Amino acid sequence: AYPELAAQLESWRKGEVSEDVFSDDEMLAADAPKATRSCGGVVLNRIFAHMPNLFGGSADLGPSNNTELKTSGYFAPDCREGCNIHFGVRELAMACIANGVALYGGLRAYCATFFVFSDYVKPALRLSALMKLPVTYVLTHDSIGVGEDGPTHQPIEQLASLRATPNTYVFRPADQKETAYAYRAALKLNAPSVMALSRQNLPQLEDTCDKAMLGGYILREPKGTPDVILMASGSEVELMYKAADILSVPVSYTHLRAHET
């Protein structure tokens, strides 16, 4: 009776992704410094415009994580069509629910919290990896700097731990474009993905491009054979550019002792 809806449901059950996601330039556009968690909010909502089977939420941190789907309501007994979920402050249960949604099929699940709280999520995330579930974990407030909440909210060892988890893809974008390409790459995976997104504003970089989907690429080609190769991700890419500018300036030390006084 409803062939178009039946075809759409079958496509969702197969885990197919709308090609429109990969040609939507709105998710790439930004002309001012912006935290990549804010960039992620733009990207999620653009994806939802093409994939209404996107389904997820945050552990009571939606406005901070920027993970609310603006054009949908919250899933509830009187709002079965809602694609946002109020998970509450229970990170492990949230991740387990996301796994269940992914296992059922048809819906593309994501969940979110602060990066530092990913330790609560880890057992369920590891099961996502073992079961090859395409759950997206949006982990925000990633930064080497201490924010207004102090060191209790400063992720340090969490990044290394998640990168060491087998069959888990960790994306740490540097700006709007890289955030969009990270989400696009994640949508092609049959495995969990982690979006490590910054707390603070970051500049929009000229050289970032779709090569971000490869995992790593050269941002600035050297004029000759390089003596040093600088590598960075996320919020440190901006600092890497500044370091490269400093290191590329020739300095003559005619009298070293003079610089020590």
Model-predicted segments: where are they?
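A short, charged/proline- and glycine-enriched loop
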Residues: 51-52, 223-228
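Thiamine diphosphate
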Residues: 2-196, 201
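Aromatic-enriched
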Residues: 202-219
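Conserved strand-to-helix beginnings and helix N-cap segments that scaffold or border functional pockets
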Residues: 121-122, 240-241, 261
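Conserved small/polar residues in nucleotide/adenosyl-binding loops
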Residues: 254-261
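Short, well-ordered secondary-structure micro-motifs
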Residues: 69, 148, 205-208, 241-242
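Short boundary motifs at domain starts and secondary-structure transition points
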Residues: 46, 218-223
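Long hydrophobic segments that form regular secondary structure
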Residues: 226-253
